[in-house]
Curated annotation (Swiss-Prot):
It catalyses: UDP-N-acetyl-alpha-D-muramoyl-L-alanyl-gamma-D-glutamyl-meso-2,6-diaminopimeloyl-D-alanyl-D-alanine + di-trans,octa-cis-undecaprenyl phosphate = di-trans,octa-cis-undecaprenyl diphospho-N-acetyl-alpha-D-muramoyl-L-alanyl-D-glutamyl-meso-2,6-diaminopimeloyl-D-alanyl-D-alanine + UMP. The chain crosses the membrane at residues 27-47, 72-92, 99-119, 139-159, 169-189, 200-220, 240-260, 264-284, 289-309, 338-358. Belongs to the glycosyltransferase 4 family. MraY subfamily. It comes from the Bacteria. This is Phospho-N-acetylmuramoyl-pentapeptide-transferase. PANTHER family: PHOSPHO-N-ACETYLMURAMOYL-PENTAPEPTIDE-TRANSFERASE, PHOSPHO-N-ACETYLMURAMOYL-PENTAPEPTIDE-TRANSFERASE HOMOLOG. Its cofactor is Mg(2+). The gene is mraY. One of its GO terms (biological process) is peptidoglycan biosynthetic process. InterPro entries: Glycosyl_transferase_4 (IPR000715), PNAcMuramoyl-5peptid_Trfase (IPR003524), PNAcMuramoyl-5peptid_Trfase_CS (IPR018480). It is found in: Cell inner membrane. HAMAP family: MraY. It is a multi-pass membrane protein.
Length: 361
């Protein structure tokens, strides 16, 4: 809402600062972080009181988890989403369609994750509601979002897929683009969800990806920078940098409480929502393929589960000691902090590779 003050800059010139995306991105980051940090202890206490036993821990998982993680409350994604929403409403341009599309997907995926977490906690079971039904709901939200993105895209960009590195490589997929882009959003949500298995493991790579796509959104939403980098100029997407800034701030606030030993888990409430947000930003900025690079860690995690399940069904043998792959390394003797920090390093390297695609032509 503060963006609207820029329209009064003729009356009070300092209000002109609210025109700048970079300023508002910083404001969103600070606001979201402060909100989560300030209200975090109260939210954690409330969730612990309501949930009692907290998130159920896998009996077939690493045995150390049964001792160190049992009783920890889940649904910490509520903290992240609250901080994110407050910051976006305060600092983003309320007239920007891409902002609202991203917010709707984030809250929609968050609601699905919340219900799943609720069932797991109340039943003290790892099984929430039907996986097929959950994917169906996610797909409906994603398809609606992709149709909206196509509707608001500039002429010549709707239903088109851009390829990184290659100059002017953009293909008109027609309505198939809706299916592809929806797959990106749903896949991103579930990939982050799979990754969220150790203290701090998911939130830091999410913030790294958000920072990367915040930069991408800012550049492709600026006609001068887009022309210089020879990437597709996508009007209006620069405002998504503010959303990414809010995510980073909320993530930092959450990490304060999620750092090992975690006081709270984000749960499906957070992981599905944040993955959906990243997928939507990638779709809006026409950098869907780059998301597979920047979010390569998430791709690796979900691929390990797919490979494990497929191998066991086809051959009766497991490729990994345990899936997702972060548990595989735990079973090999890596300590939890080793797995987490090494995976963070991988996320940083992949983010830099993703940014490099902007310049390579």
């Amino acid at each position: 809402m503060l963006y609207l003050l820029s329209e009064l800059s003729g009356v009070f010139s300092p209000f002109n600062v609210f025109r700048y995306i970079t300023f508002r991105t910083g404001g969103a980051l600070f606001t979201a972080g402060l909100f989560v940090f300030w209200f975090g202890p109260w939210i954690i206490s409330l969730l612990r009181l309501r949930q009692g036993k907290g998130q159920p821990i896998r009996e077939d998982g690493p045995q150390t988890h049964l001792l160190t993680k049992r009783g920890t409350p889940t649904m910490g994604g509520l903290m992240i989403l609250a901080g994110l929403l407050v910051a976006v409403l305060l600092w983003a341009n309320p007239r920007n369609s891409y902002v609202w599309i991203t917010v709707v997907v984030t809250l929609g995926f968050g609601a699905i994750g919340f219900y799943d977490d609720y069932l797991k906690v109340t039943k003290q079971s790892h099984k929430g509601f039907s996986g097929k039904f959950r994917l169906g709901l996610e797909a409906l939200i994603a398809v609606a979002a992709c149709v909206a993105v196509a509707e608001y895209s500039a002429p010549g960009l709707a239903y088109r897929l851009a390829f990184p590195v290659f100059k002017d490589a953009i293909v008109n997929l027609g309505l198939f683009w809706i299916l592809f882009a929806s797959f990106v959003i749903v896949g991103a949500g579930n990939a982050v969800n799979i990754t969220d298995g150790l203290d701090g493991l998911a939130i830091v790579p999410v913030m790294i990806a958000a920072a990367t796509f915040g930069i991408i959104a800012y550049l492709v939403g600026n006609v001068i920078y887009a022309s210089y980098l020879q990437v597709n100029y996508v009007p209006g997407t620069g405002e998504l940098a503010v959303v990414c800034g809010a995510l980073i701030g909320a993530g930092l606030g959450f990490l304060w409480f999620n750092a090992p030993p975690a006081q709270i888990f984000m749960g499906d409430t957070g992981s599905l929502a944040l993955g959906g947000l990243l997928g939507t930003v990638a779709v809006a900025t026409k950098h869907e393929i780059v998301l597979a690079v920047v979010g390569g860690l998430f791709v690796l995690e979900i691929a390990s589960v797919i490979i494990q399940v497929a191998s066991f069904k086809l051959t009766g043998k497991r490729v990994f000691r345990m899936a997702p792959i972060h548990h595989h390394f735990e079973q090999k003797g890596w300590k939890e902090p080793q797995v987490v920090i090494r995976f963070w390093i991988i996320a940083v390297v992949l983010a830099l590779l993703g940014l490099a695609t902007l310049k390579l032509r």
